[in-house]
């Protein structure tokens, strides 16, 4: 029993240390407090987190255009939950601009991270959107 609890705690800890969870948190903080400077504490994923956060923020207009052009009938960004929108934007940034990471890895990592922030039905919706979009953005992956 104790071994099982220890394993479960470590499993949760390792999931919680996912760099994509940190990306989502940083983007949410930026959305809620746009004037605040974004802090990137030292970690093995610091460069990755900084690249994705800055890239998502800098290219948010382009990402929004991508969503509108590929998913106009599937999603209304004005009515989309803020956290879902943040996760979607970060994942699309990676799909469009981080070609060194396979699309399946990007999607599965954001779906895992989304479990901390979204309801199960929203995670399913996110999965469908990312799957559809990834097929259009990365045909050769």
Question: Each PLM stretch: what is its role?
Answer:
Residues 1-116, 122, 127-141:
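N-terminal interaction/assembly modules
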């Amino acid at each position: 029993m104790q071994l099982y609890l220890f394993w479960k705690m470590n499993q949760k800890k390792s999931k919680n240390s996912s760099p994509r969870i940190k990306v989502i948190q940083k983007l949410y903080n930026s959305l809620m407090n746009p004037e605040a400077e974004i802090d990137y504490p030292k970690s093995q994923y610091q460069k990755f987190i900084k690249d994705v956060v800055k890239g998502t923020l800098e290219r948010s207009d382009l990402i929004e255009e991508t969503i509108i052009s590929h998913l106009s009938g599937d999603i209304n960004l004005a009515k989309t939950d803020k956290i879902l929108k943040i996760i979607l934007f970060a994942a699309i940034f990676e799909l469009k601009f981080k070609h060194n990471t396979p699309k399946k890895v990007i999607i599965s990592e954001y779906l895992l991270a989304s479990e901390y922030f979204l309801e199960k039905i929203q995670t399913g919706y996110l999965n469908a959107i990312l799957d559809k979009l990834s097929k259009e953005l990365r045909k050769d992956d």
